[in-house]
Amino acid sequence: MTMIPVIDLEEKIRTIEKPWSPIDITYINDQVIRAAIFHGDYHWHKHDDEDELFLVHRGAIRIQVKGEDTIELAEGQLCVIPKGVEHRPGSDEPSVVLMFEPSALKSTGD
C-alpha cells in the first residue's frame, strides 16, 4: 500500500533561509509548488516557455509588468504571468508566496 504524505506547509516555510531563495514544497506531474519569501524587489526577467502562478500565502506583493499597470496582490490572491512577459515581483514587507510552475522552470529567472 502506498503511503500518501501529508505536507506541513508552515513547517516547510520555516526552512526558507532568506528572501528570494525558493524551496520546493512538492511535485505534481510535471509541476512544482515552490515557496519563497519576497522582500524588496527582484530583478526584471521573463520565462520564454512557461507560465508562472503566484499565490500570496501571507502578506502582500506587487508584480511590475513591462508596459502594463503594476499588479497588487493581497493575502489569498493569485495571478498567472504568461510566458514571455517581462516582470519584476517585489514586496515592502516580508511576504510568503507560493509559486506553481513547471518543474523545469529556473526559479532565478533568465
Give short role names for the model-derived ranges:
Residues 32-48:
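Conserved short histidine dyad/triad with adjacent acidic residue
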Residues 40, 49-62, 66-67:
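Glycine- and acidic-residue-biased ligand/ion/polar-headgroup-sensing regions
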Residues 67-83:
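Short acidic-glycine-tyrosine-enriched beta hairpin
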Residues 83-110:
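Ligand-binding loop in jelly-roll beta-barrel domains
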